[in-house]
């Protein structure tokens, strides 16, 4: 058995889409296990950019099975739009199967309304939500008032749940947020129609995955966001509303944890963050601008500029520990080309002058921490055509070696450009 989970080691946007796309060639099945359409995976195939927010990145490969697991919050409109875009671009392979868990919770219009109204009202203390309704959908799931994909096929049950939910949500929208109420019948008609359109894809995906595992098939579990956006282990409250670490690959897919043999952590060669929250190594100078412009650091979902800074190995080490990462894939190494000096954060110094290798849980304490850097020499060479480690400049290899030492995890892949072919593959995680 050789099943692989891929998770981000930072605040998302690490380049997971490209890596998942590459690893899909070795896998039989690709499964999304958490999040929703608040994350965007950017893929470049044959010079064409494709951004997927909900459908697993493996959809571009033929003879694969793609699964949207029970841990995902599912927006049927976004799903149907992505299917249509893939069909129009002639990007849907003829023999690839796609399934949606009947247990996945639906993102409803009132989730989006509340998400946006809440963020607009929160003056000075914004979380930086995408406004896609992800958080409110997870809130309803935990509160046991959520509506699941499978409920769309029991019309009386669906209407009853919707009516009860809207009674509460409309009261909140009109009386607290001073927003417009939503119409029960309009939503019911809309979502029941969605239900019929997505029906061919809906299944008990836990059973499908279990069957395929017993047949010896290889599964790639695709995480969204990054470890430090995890609702438990991230920079709370500046986090997403789900568990983004590897342990949720099991829970969010409906299979046992012993079925996952390898966890690959995706680590950008520098650090970025979208939205609010502490960022100890953030650069607001020419180097930060270089990273932002050369790396094209704009959110795939929101289009917002990403904040950029030096690589923070305190955060990466924590991600390695929490997710049990044994293999690292380094992305966007090419963005650092041309910089005279490179810095790596190896620890923090607190406001009281104490040195620590670990990130504090308190956001106040973290925001007061100063990064402690190691400095390395950079390189001038263009590395886009590197296909083996020996093709890289000496200083690039030294940089990677130091990252490996600090993370205490082996580098198995280095991405030197956006294209599939612009990659140095050192090990196949499916053959461990």
Feature-to-residue mapping (PLM):
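Non-transmembrane, aqueous-exposed alpha-helical and coiled segments at domain scale
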Residues: 1-432
């Amino acid at each position: 058995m050789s099943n692989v989970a891929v998770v981000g080691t930072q605040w998302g946007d690490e380049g997971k889409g490209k890596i998942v796309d590459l690893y899909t060639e070795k896998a039989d099945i690709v499964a999304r296990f958490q999040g929703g359409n608040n994350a965007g995976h950017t893929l470049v195939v044959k010079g064409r950019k494709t951004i997927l927010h909900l459908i697993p990145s493996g959809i571009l490969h033929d003879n694969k099975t793609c699964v949207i697991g029970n841990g995902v919050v599912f927006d049927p409109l976004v799903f149907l739009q992505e299917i249509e875009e893939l069909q129009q671009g002639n990007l849907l392979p003829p023999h690839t199967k796609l399934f949606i868990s009947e247990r996945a919770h639906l993102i409803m219009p009132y989730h989006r309304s509340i998400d946006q109204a809440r963020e607009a009202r929160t003056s000075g203390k914004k979380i930086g939500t995408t406004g896609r309704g992800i958080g409110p959908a997870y809130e309803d799931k935990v509160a046991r008032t959520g509506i699941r994909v499978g409920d769309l096929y029991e019309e009386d049950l669906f209407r009853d749940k919707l009516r009860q939910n809207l009674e509460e949500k409309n009261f909140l929208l009109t009386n607290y947020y001073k927003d417009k109420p939503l119409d029960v019948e309009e939503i019911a008609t809309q979502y029941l129609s969605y239900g019929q359109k997505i029906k061919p894809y809906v299944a008990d995906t836990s059973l499908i995955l279990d069957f395929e595992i017993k047949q010896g098939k290889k599964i790639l579990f695709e995480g969204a966001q990054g470890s430090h956006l995890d609702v438990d282990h991230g920079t709370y409250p500046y986090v997403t509303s789900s568990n983004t670490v590897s342990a949720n690959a099991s829970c969010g897919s409906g299979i046992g944890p012993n079925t996952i043999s390898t966890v690959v952590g995706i680590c950008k060669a520098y650090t970025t963050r979208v939205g609010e929250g502490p960022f100890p190594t953030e650069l607001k100078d020419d180097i930060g601008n270089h990273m932002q412009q050369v790396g094209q650091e704009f959110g795939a979902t929101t289009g917002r500029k990403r904040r950029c800074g030096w690589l923070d190995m305190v955060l990466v080490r924590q991600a390695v520990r929490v997710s049990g990462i044994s293999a690292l894939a380094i992305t966007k190494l090419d963005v650092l080309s041309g910089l005279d000096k490179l810095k790596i954060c190896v620890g923090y110094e607190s406001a009281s002058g104490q040195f620590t290798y670990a990130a504090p849980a308190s956001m106040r304490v973290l925001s007061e921490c100063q990064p402690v850097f190691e400095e390395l020499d950079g390189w001038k060479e263009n590395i886009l055509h590197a296909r083996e480690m020996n093709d890289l400049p000496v200083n690039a290899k030294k940089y990677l070696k130091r990252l490996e030492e600090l993370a205490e995890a082996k580098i198995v892949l280095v991405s030197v450009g956006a294209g599939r072919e612009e990659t140095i593959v050192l090990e196949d995680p499916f053959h461990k």
